[in-house]
Amino acid sequence: MSGTRASNDRSSHPGAGGHKRPRYDVGNKVTVVLGAQWGDEGKGKVVDLLAMDSDIICRCQGGNNAGHTVVVEGKEYDFHLFPSGIINPKAISFIGNGVVIHLPGLFEEADKNEKKGLKDWEKRLIISDRAHIVCDFHQAVDGLQEVQRQAQEGKNIGTTKKGIGPTYSSKASRTGLRICDLLSDFDEFSARFKNLAHQYQSMFSNLEVDVDGQLKKLKMYAEKIRPMVRDGVYFMYDALHGSPKKILVEGANAALLDIDFGTYPFVTSSNCTVGGVCTGLGIPPQNVGNVYGVVKAYTTRVGIGAFPTEQINESGTLLQTRGHEWGVTTGRKRRCGWLDLVILRYAHMINGFTALALTKLDILDVLDEIKVGVAYRLNGKRIPYFPANQEILQKIEVEYEVMPGWKSDTTGARKWDDLPTKAQNYIRFVETHIGVPVKWVGVGKSRESMIELF
């Protein structure tokens, strides 16, 4: 992982009158881990590997709608809002300005993980003062909007009802409340809180808001988080331009859930592609180093929306059962299908992956043959792009390559040579098709079952 410093070699030759021009130093670079499908690819596991020797681990977007499970020494930790690097006692965890924070959720998550052995997290967590606050009424509105969508269109987005969408809506309409507002003049904050609550009540007549109760709770949380809050821009600038440091950015959600590039409208409300790293932390693009894409060896999706390689048959059921495919945040069953290299290529176009992590390869161990989606056809013609429109995406026919299964247990593999030849061929096929090397292969739940290839 790149903790190196780079300088821009526009050399400092003397200009007119012998004046020595300053030389721009790029500073440290951040390593980024992003989901390359519809989420649940196993990003937490890759982050966990890299977090062990990172100095700073950051979250740049999303909220507690994300769900990461990390297994350490047989204990399962569940993280939603915390960077999963919080379990590294030597690292600082940073929640950036692009994240939306539900304070009761933050402390509930801390309590649950403290019971499993997480210690001194409050000494290692830093929160950007520019991050927006998810209020309890944002969560209530999330549920009401979903009911409304169901009634009007007979379909819902499948939101986690964590208030993420309504909070980003408040942010975009410039009525949102930020951590810095909560920590300054509380009377001013209270007035703005009441205005926002009344705005939502005028839209949803059945929305009940205990204004005084919520403000009382927020005042209590304000004092609890005050020691953790910093100016995030200065914090990141110092981290990039101080001594050499390994900085890791943990993406939440995934490319196909991105508000701009995902399968809109069945997406989340933030940019979960690489651009969200710069806007969600306040760092320049030249400080982005390696970008690792995490992809499952098959494809899953939670909730409704187009899913070209979905298998509503025995193959899909087998993947769901063997892969234990239900959500960390919602407990909902995930829809399952074959690996789709069209969406992976599309995610690479946007993110510029420097390497991939291919997870859950072992789930395919029992299959006689494995299909891989390699191209889309629309009205019988191959198309060279990923369609933006949902109706068109529903009509797509997938062109498959059929590969022989390896029919043997890979869960004990710890290096490349331990993998069956046909499994190696599957990995090579993905690499060749996308033009990006696979750096890790996952064959089980534990940290040890991530095989590092280079």
UniProtKB/Swiss-Prot annotation:
Subcellular location: Cytoplasm
PROSITE patterns, sorted: ADENYLOSUCCIN_SYN_1, ADENYLOSUCCIN_SYN_2
Binding site for Mg(2+): D40, G67
Major localisation: cytoplasm
Enzyme Commission code(s) on record: 6.3.4.4
Domain of life per record: Eukaryota
Protein's name according to its UniProt entry: Adenylosuccinate synthetase isozyme 1 B
UniProt source species: Xenopus laevis (African clawed frog)
